[in-house]
Amino acid sequence: MSSRKKMVLGGLFEANGYHSSAWLLPSAQDRAPTDVDYFRRIVRMAEDGQPDFFFPADTPAARTENPDAWTRGPLYMNMMEPITLLSAIAGATSHIGLGATASTSFYEPYNVARLFASLDHISHGRAAWNVVTSANDYAARNFGLDRLPPHDRRYAKAREFFEIVRGLWDTWEDDAFIYDKANVRMFDPEKFHVLDHEGEFFKVHGGLNMARPPQGSPVIFQAGASEAGKELAAETAEVVFGTGASRDEAIQFYRDLKGRMAKFGRHPDELKILSGVSIVVGENEQQAREKWAFWQENVHIDIGLL
């Protein structure tokens, strides 16, 4: 009897919906983007449905170029920092994975290592890091840059960034902390490893002042579809958000990415590739279609022209 493959399911979530008009529904909860109790309720409901992970949408910037237009469809204009949010959600859930984005273009490796190791401890081994290099100059301007560095340069930096973070997570071996009170030894020095990294982009001595994350390494997500992005994913990722405007394109992306893994010493089964679908929810099909029609009819011309 052949074994059945398990489909990986997750929820990517924006509090007022991904459609620019979703917030206009009378049932939309106005304060949801900054209401942690709302998120806890939503994720507990999701957990009851047995998905594998929850992933809040994020971008580290407000759109400032045309506020009069963005007020019509304010996607990403009001949202909490995702790692902090997931830490609050962790205590209200028990088994759903908790994923967040942190950009290798804007963070420092030591900070990312600490943040996701902490989330992994808080959630008892449910953290996931979505590794991105970012794609928008408007976000770069919040981090001392006029514009993003060139694409290939960003990915070279991302590779080094990832190696540092993974090395910091390996500062301590799993059984390094022994708490031997009789001999006054909290940890075994032989199981403490200083990274002492010096590379093209970063100089990080280490090590991480936190016990090894419960998973060893939090789950690694990526979404890059460029050549550099696919190379990094084939080398490092465990889950990739796939692309493709058609079934044939999705199949080609799947085969391409899986086919790159052998040169990095990895088996294709070590990587899951997920396709995205936007869902309009209603008590029945008619209600869902009416909701979709309402959204479409209420797309403001200012948003359509952005």
Report the location of each language-model feature.
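An alpha-helical appendage that flanks or caps ligand/catalytic pockets
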Residues: 2-18, 152-215, 245-306
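Hydrophobic or amphipathic alpha-helical targeting/insertion segments
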Residues: 92, 97-143, 149-152, 157-161
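Hydrophobic faces of well-ordered beta-strands that scaffold small-molecule active sites
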Residues: 7-11, 54-56, 96-102, 125-131, ...
